Amino acid sequence: MDIRTYFNQRAAHWDDGEQSVDQIRRMIAFLSDIQEGMSVLDVACGTGAMFEALRERKPSHITAVDLSEKMIEIAARKVEGDSLFELQCRDLFEMTQETFDRIIIYNAYPHFMEKDKVVQKVAELLNPGGRFIVAHGACREKINGCHTNVPKEITSGLLSAKEESRLWE
Protein backbone atom coordinates (compact mmCIF):
# COMPACT_ATOMS: atom_id res chain seq x y z
CA MET A 1 0.00 0.00 0.00
CA ASP A 2 1.32 3.46 -0.79
CA ILE A 3 1.11 6.44 1.55
CA ARG A 4 -1.57 8.28 -0.47
CA THR A 5 -3.89 5.26 -0.38
CA TYR A 6 -3.22 4.72 3.33
CA PHE A 7 -4.30 8.25 4.27
CA ASN A 8 -7.19 8.38 1.79
CA GLN A 9 -8.62 5.30 3.51
CA ARG A 10 -8.41 6.96 6.94
CA ALA A 11 -9.47 10.52 6.09
CA ALA A 12 -13.15 10.24 7.02
CA HIS A 13 -12.36 9.41 10.66
CA TRP A 14 -9.04 11.21 11.07
CA ASP A 15 -10.45 14.00 13.26
CA ASP A 16 -12.27 11.69 15.69
CA GLY A 17 -11.19 12.70 19.19
CA GLU A 18 -8.92 15.54 18.04
CA GLN A 19 -10.62 18.34 20.01
CA SER A 20 -8.74 17.27 23.15
CA VAL A 21 -5.45 18.58 21.75
CA ASP A 22 -6.58 22.09 20.72
CA GLN A 23 -4.52 23.68 23.51
CA ILE A 24 -1.46 21.73 22.44
CA ARG A 25 -1.84 22.97 18.87
CA ARG A 26 -2.23 26.57 20.08
CA MET A 27 0.95 26.20 22.13
CA ILE A 28 2.79 24.79 19.11
CA ALA A 29 1.68 27.76 16.98
CA PHE A 30 2.75 30.17 19.74
CA LEU A 31 6.16 28.53 20.20
CA SER A 32 6.64 28.58 16.42
CA ASP A 33 6.81 32.37 16.78
CA ILE A 34 4.48 32.97 13.86
CA GLN A 35 4.15 36.74 13.63
CA GLU A 36 1.47 38.82 11.99
CA GLY A 37 2.13 39.10 8.26
CA MET A 38 4.31 36.00 7.92
CA SER A 39 3.84 33.28 5.33
CA VAL A 40 3.32 29.74 6.64
CA LEU A 41 3.54 26.34 4.97
CA ASP A 42 1.60 23.54 6.71
CA VAL A 43 3.18 20.36 5.32
CA ALA A 44 1.15 17.14 5.32
CA CYS A 45 -1.72 19.20 6.71
CA GLY A 46 -4.09 16.25 6.68
CA THR A 47 -7.60 17.38 7.57
CA GLY A 48 -6.41 20.77 8.79
CA ALA A 49 -5.72 20.02 12.44
CA MET A 50 -3.45 23.08 12.80
CA PHE A 51 -5.61 25.54 10.83
CA GLU A 52 -7.35 27.28 13.72
CA ALA A 53 -4.18 27.60 15.80
CA LEU A 54 -2.27 28.98 12.80
CA ARG A 55 -5.08 31.40 11.88
CA GLU A 56 -5.02 32.86 15.41
CA ARG A 57 -1.37 33.90 14.90
CA LYS A 58 -2.48 36.23 12.03
CA PRO A 59 -0.06 35.29 9.26
CA SER A 60 -0.56 36.92 5.87
CA HIS A 61 -0.96 33.60 4.07
CA ILE A 62 -1.11 29.90 4.89
CA THR A 63 -0.32 27.34 2.21
CA ALA A 64 -1.37 23.85 3.24
CA VAL A 65 -0.28 20.79 1.28
CA ASP A 66 -1.06 17.11 1.57
CA LEU A 67 -0.80 14.30 -0.95
CA SER A 68 -4.06 12.67 0.17
CA GLU A 69 -6.97 13.94 -1.90
CA LYS A 70 -9.50 12.93 0.75
CA MET A 71 -7.59 14.65 3.55
CA ILE A 72 -7.44 17.87 1.50
CA GLU A 73 -11.19 17.63 0.74
CA ILE A 74 -11.97 17.55 4.47
CA ALA A 75 -9.47 20.33 5.21
CA ALA A 76 -10.94 22.51 2.45
CA ARG A 77 -14.40 22.32 4.02
CA LYS A 78 -12.95 23.76 7.25
CA VAL A 79 -11.65 26.90 5.54
CA GLU A 80 -14.10 27.29 2.66
CA GLY A 81 -14.24 30.94 1.60
CA ASP A 82 -11.26 31.94 3.79
CA SER A 83 -8.73 33.68 1.52
CA LEU A 84 -6.00 33.29 4.16
CA PHE A 85 -5.66 29.64 3.14
CA GLU A 86 -4.43 28.07 -0.08
CA LEU A 87 -4.83 24.30 -0.06
CA GLN A 88 -3.01 22.09 -2.52
CA CYS A 89 -3.11 18.37 -3.06
CA ARG A 90 0.57 17.89 -3.79
CA ASP A 91 3.79 16.49 -2.47
CA LEU A 92 6.19 18.76 -0.59
CA PHE A 93 8.92 17.74 -3.01
CA GLU A 94 6.98 19.16 -5.98
CA MET A 95 7.20 22.68 -4.56
CA THR A 96 9.80 24.80 -6.31
CA GLN A 97 8.82 28.46 -6.55
CA GLU A 98 7.33 29.35 -3.17
CA THR A 99 9.21 30.41 -0.03
CA PHE A 100 7.94 30.75 3.53
CA ASP A 101 8.75 32.33 6.87
CA ARG A 102 7.60 29.27 8.80
CA ILE A 103 7.28 25.66 7.69
CA ILE A 104 5.48 23.30 10.05
CA ILE A 105 4.96 19.56 10.05
CA TYR A 106 2.43 18.57 12.70
CA ASN A 107 1.85 14.89 13.51
CA ALA A 108 3.28 13.78 10.16
CA TYR A 109 7.09 13.70 10.41
CA PRO A 110 7.28 9.90 10.89
CA HIS A 111 5.62 9.49 7.49
CA PHE A 112 8.51 11.13 5.64
CA MET A 113 10.66 8.14 4.86
CA GLU A 114 13.60 10.08 3.41
CA LYS A 115 14.29 12.64 6.12
CA ASP A 116 17.46 13.86 4.39
CA LYS A 117 15.34 14.98 1.43
CA VAL A 118 13.00 16.83 3.81
CA VAL A 119 16.05 18.70 5.15
CA GLN A 120 17.09 19.73 1.64
CA LYS A 121 13.60 20.79 0.56
CA VAL A 122 12.92 22.80 3.71
CA ALA A 123 16.23 24.61 3.25
CA GLU A 124 15.13 25.56 -0.29
CA LEU A 125 11.68 26.76 0.78
CA LEU A 126 12.55 28.74 3.92
CA ASN A 127 13.08 32.48 3.68
CA PRO A 128 16.26 33.82 5.32
CA GLY A 129 15.67 33.84 9.06
CA GLY A 130 12.78 31.40 8.67
CA ARG A 131 12.00 28.52 10.98
CA PHE A 132 11.13 24.89 10.50
CA ILE A 133 8.94 23.30 13.15
CA VAL A 134 8.34 19.58 13.68
CA ALA A 135 5.72 19.02 16.36
CA HIS A 136 3.40 16.33 17.63
CA GLY A 137 0.37 16.27 19.87
CA ALA A 138 1.73 13.37 21.90
CA CYS A 139 5.04 12.01 23.18
CA ARG A 140 7.36 9.91 21.03
CA GLU A 141 6.47 6.68 22.83
CA LYS A 142 2.75 7.16 22.24
CA ILE A 143 3.27 8.07 18.58
CA ASN A 144 5.53 5.08 17.98
CA GLY A 145 2.99 2.89 19.79
CA CYS A 146 0.23 4.09 17.46
CA HIS A 147 2.39 3.17 14.49
CA THR A 148 3.26 -0.40 15.50
CA ASN A 149 0.68 -1.83 13.08
CA VAL A 150 1.28 0.70 10.30
CA PRO A 151 3.16 -0.72 7.30
CA LYS A 152 6.87 0.13 7.40
CA GLU A 153 6.63 1.83 3.99
CA ILE A 154 4.18 4.33 5.57
CA THR A 155 6.05 5.26 8.76
CA SER A 156 9.56 5.24 10.13
CA GLY A 157 8.54 6.07 13.67
CA LEU A 158 10.25 8.75 15.71
CA LEU A 159 13.77 8.65 17.05
CA SER A 160 14.79 10.73 20.04
CA ALA A 161 15.06 14.47 19.42
CA LYS A 162 18.85 14.18 19.67
CA GLU A 163 18.97 11.43 17.03
CA GLU A 164 16.53 13.20 14.69
CA SER A 165 18.40 16.50 14.99
CA ARG A 166 21.61 15.00 13.59
CA LEU A 167 20.09 15.34 10.12
CA TRP A 168 19.77 19.08 10.64
CA GLU A 169 23.38 19.81 11.58
Q: Language-model segments: what does each one mean?
A:
Residues 1-35, 49-53, 133-159:
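Conserved class I S-adenosyl-L-methionine
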Residues 39, 130-131:
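Short glycine-centered segments of the SAM/dcSAM-binding site in methyltransferase folds
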Residues 41, 47-94:
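Class I SAM-dependent methyltransferase SAM/SAH-binding core
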Residues 104:
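A conserved beta-strand element that flanks and buttresses the S-adenosyl-L-methionine
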Residues 107-108:
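Short catalytic micro-motifs in class I SAM-dependent methyltransferases
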Residues 116-128:
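A short glycine-rich, Lys/Arg-flanked "PGG" loop and its adjoining helix->strand segment in the class I
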Residues 156-169:
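Short alpha-helix
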